[in-house]
């Protein structure tokens, strides 16, 4: 993997693989060819993945769409709520990655998708979906994103966001309580029993599969370089 200091050389030497998607031109009734680049953003819980992803989305609001791997947690309608709380959500099997792969392929082909929505407070998939249209840049974010070789194959650029372990757990507690309405005791218990051990088993090893390693989601140098790369890709038409 590459670190922050490798960015200039990396982006001068390496061009992201680009696929061409064909979309229906609603205004002219024809089709247009559109370059599509998929960028994967991964890293441990609370590392700053979402911060980094949101900064990129904000920089290119009209050209970037975001897919969150978390929304692909399996539907658990047949499991009682108390039992859902005990599920190991930090294991790859907890995610319906087959559906994610299918959706990424559709987006690359210029097709829209109906993305599932996950309800963290209920530990279950919502019955609602989000309509997602393909765009020039597709950001895919998730803790376990790189564990599946099919996903890695679809990603043109792979970014791993790193952060100190203590900093990550503090961020997770704050986020899950304030943003996801979860119980503090449950958060701490989950971290000790599944999040921490699964991080070292599945997440951290993926650091070596990343093209770029970013130290913190608020790393301005890394953000500026990735933003410049995206700008270059958008100007290639």
Protein language model annotation of sequence segments:
Residues 49:
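Conserved lysine of the Walker
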Residues 79-120:
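Conserved nucleotide-sensing/catalytic segment adjacent to the nucleotide-binding pocket
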Residues 62-77:
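Short beta-strand-centered segment that lines the nucleotide-binding/catalytic pocket of NTP-utilizing
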Residues 52:
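Hydrophobic positions on the alpha1 helix immediately C-terminal to the Walker A/P-loop
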Residues 133-134, 174, 196-237:
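NTP-dependent small-molecule kinase module
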Residues 10-33:
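Short, Lys/Arg-enriched N-terminal segments with co-localized hydrophobic residues
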Residues 126-179:
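ATP-dependent NMP and nucleoside kinases share a basic, alpha-helical "lid"
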Residues 44:
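P-loop (Walker A) phosphate-binding loop of NTP-binding proteins
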